[in-house]
Amino acid sequence: MVTYSANYSTSFQKRSPFAVHNRRSNMARMDFNNIVGDPFALITISTSLIAWLLSFATCVISDIQGAFPNFAWWAVGYMLCAIIGISLVLASQTSHVYGVAIVGYLAAGLTFTTLAVNSLIYDDQASKQAGAAGFILQSMVTIVWIFYFGSSSQTSSRPYLDSMGAGKEHPSYRNSKPLSTNYGARPETVVSGNQPPQMYTSAQLNGFETSSPVSGYPPTAANGAENGTQNRFVGPAIGSQSNLGGGSTLGADHPSTPNEVSQPTVYPYRAKAIYSYEANPDDANEISFSKHEILDVSDVSGRWWQAKKASGETGIAPSNYLILI
């Protein structure tokens, strides 16, 4: 019997630590076209900057004219840092990575701007009232940002806002995981040309026999339980074998052909990419796709989906990068 060790299976292979380090060491690339090409990012950042300049200028004038609450200066400085940080995150398209931290910072900023409004709006001095108006406008933008960054990608509003900039967005954060990174071993839905089939002997499969035979491979009583087990477990993994007679064994007469494993021909589902993904160069089964790209999907069970691109390229894609449409 010709058998292959489990080490040949891609499910048991461990990636090189150097390859993992190289993939994780890729930093996000800054591209301010992601802001210019996204109406939501452009409008909110522009509005927040105008509101900040209004509050800063009026606070300077109010401080020159007379007594001024020092707490308002802290709100001015804090919101400037928040606006710069959000601009960098949107420019690098890493909102799914830093979204939780951004919501926390914005919640604190909303508190500061609200207290600054309370300190300035009731004063009779016109410059202080104008400063309060600037803080009110910043608070409104902050509320919108909290809703955006705090919303999950599964909501209807987040993909809609992200789709506004689909024409000019570029994949900038290499292979970052927006949700869970604990995938573990995934099923091999496509067999690579350079990978031998995963097969085991009857001794290795002892205790895993099924009570009923696999369709198309009936066990024969004349050959005993061992040959029946071999027919059930080894036979289906070889696409080139169409007939296994009684007493047949895997040898030179029945060569294995791993490339003949059929791929799905029906893709009943359609999915939209909510993040860009670059396939692992060490795994020929994965496919790359860009944000907002539409893919045809054959199976939506599990963490990796068998997908087909518009160009006809097929492979597997991580399910947490896709949303069904």
Curated annotation (Swiss-Prot):
Q: Which residues lie on this side of the membrane: Cytoplasmic?
A: 1-40, 92-96, 151-325
Bridged cysteine pairs (disulfide)? none
Under the heading Pfam families, the entry gives:
SH3_1
Where is each SH3 domain found? 266-325
The biased composition feature labelled Polar residues covers: 173-182
Q: Which InterPro entries match?
A: SH3-like_dom_sf, SH3_domain, Sho1_SH3
Subcellular location field: Cell membrane
GO CC annotations on file: plasma membrane
What residue ranges are annotated as transmembrane? 41-61, 71-91, 97-117, 130-150
Family, per the entry?
Answer: Belongs to the SHO1 family.
Q: What is this protein called?
A: High osmolarity signaling protein SHO1
